Amino acid sequence: MPTTLRRAHVHRLPMRSPDDVAALEAAITQGTIDPAGIVAILGKTEGNGCVNDFTRAFAVRSLEALLGRHLATEAVRQIAMVMSGGTEGALSPHMIVFEAREVDEGHAPRAFAASLALGRARTPVLPSEHLGRMQQVAQVAAGVRAAMNDAGITDAGDVHYVQVKCPLLTMERIEAAEARGVRTAVRDTLKSMGFSRGASALGVAVALGELAMDELSDTEICTDYARYSERAATSGGVELLDHEIMVAGMSRDWTGPLAIDHGVMRDAIDIEPARAALARLGLDVPGQLPAAARGRIAAVLAKAEAAQSGKVRDVRHTMLDDSDVSSTRHARAFVGGALAGLFGFTDLFVSGGAEHQGPDGGGPVAIIVERT
């Protein structure tokens, strides 16, 4: 009998402003994208990426308004919309639309044994007093397992990228918690972003078997950076109270030419792991990728973080000493430039704030390629 499998499609679309959904609207009109198949939308918006970056919520509302014309309200809510603020340097604002379709493979032999697989999940609302603590780690771990199940991925070793959009604390949320007689992990709203990202990343590590729950405690979150996930990418935002999770990996139950692999940068200029991942995906070329090879790259997804040591390869950096510009903004620009030099384009999904996401000062890089 013919076999019905799922096939992933990835569309990288430009954005002229945080509310610009014209490219997505055109793709839907032309039939290139089926709204019913959208699993997740990741976007880089041109805000500051900090607590008061409302470009993320602006972009989400614009996407919801567009998709609401094609889908029921609950169907729109199920789409993971993860906006990452900050396009410092020459990083280009863009969105990446992840779509899944069912296809009938017929009786012909499959071109590839395994293909890109996508899954998503949402967690319950996280109480403010649980943010940055072990309760958040546990909640995210459960959410990642649910997203893996949605993707049909049973082996955590087949997962190459986990994107988590996590909440942060505002003074209003902190005061509401204190009015209930509880205290939050931190009272600094900007620091709360780091604690939320860090706890979420450790939740990914637990779900993927990189760490065990009994190895962790509240005191190690955002203090012991020797504990991390090599496949987590977490972004904080004011626009949600729960977690939106997308898992990307490889599965024999999916078909199509798309494949994903990842590497882990050991510091902000360590591009060789990304080059090695490209080689494993069939793009083993010296220097910057030539135009023909660039055309096969569906997405580049990376994390960036200023090293807590204050140094890059034993030479001092000033990213942590700048009182005017957050270190996450410096790191995005710096790592974005390093990766753009390798890939040859600037619409890279480089997200700042890599607490417990790769080694201190480094971070994971996932690459999705169309195989031939």
Swiss-Prot record:
Parts of the chain that traverse the membrane: none
Residue ranges, annotated region (RU C): 258-372
Keywords on record: Hydrolase, Magnesium, Metal-binding
Activity regulation comment: Inhibited by barbituric acid.
UniProt pathway: Xenobiotic degradation; atrazine degradation; biuret from cyanurate: step 1/1
Record GO biological process: atrazine catabolic process
Region of interest: RU B: 115-252
UniProt-listed InterPro entries: AtzD/Barbiturase (IPR014086), AtzD/Barbiturase_RUA (IPR043008), AtzD/Barbiturase_RUB (IPR043006), AtzD/Barbiturase_RUC (IPR043007)
The protein's enzyme class: hydrolase
MF GO annotations: cyanuric acid amidohydrolase activity; metal ion binding
Region (RU A): 1-105
Domain of life of the organism encoding this protein: Bacteria
Site (Important for substrate specificity): T328
EC numbers on record: 3.5.2.15
A Pfam family: Amido_AtzD_TrzD
Catalytic activity from the UniProt record: cyanurate + H2O = 1-carboxybiuret + H(+)
NAD as UniProt keyword: no
Record's keyword annotation contains Hydrolase: yes
Catalytic machinery residues: K165, S235 (nucleophile)
Sites where the protein binds Mg(2+): E305, A354, Q357, G358, P359, G362
Residues that coordinate or bind substrate: R56, S84, G85, R197, S235, G236, R332, S351, G352
Stated family: Belongs to the cyclic amide hydrolase (CyAH) family.
Domain notes: The monomer structure is formed from three repeating units (RUs) that share the same structure as one another. The monomer, the active site and substrate all possess threefold rotational symmetry, to the extent that the active site possesses three potential Ser-Lys catalytic dyads. It is possible that any or all of the three active-site serines may act as nucleophile (albeit only one can do so per catalytic cycle).
The protein's role, per its UniProt record: Responsible for the hydrolysis of cyanuric acid, an intermediate formed during catabolism of s-triazine based compounds in herbicides such as atrazine and polymers such as melamine. Catalyzes the hydrolytic opening of the s-triazine ring of cyanuric acid (2,4,6-trihydroxy-s-triazine) to yield carbon dioxide and carboxybiuret, which spontaneously decarboxylates to biuret.
Quaternary data: Homotetramer.
Protein name as it appears in the record: Cyanuric acid amidohydrolase
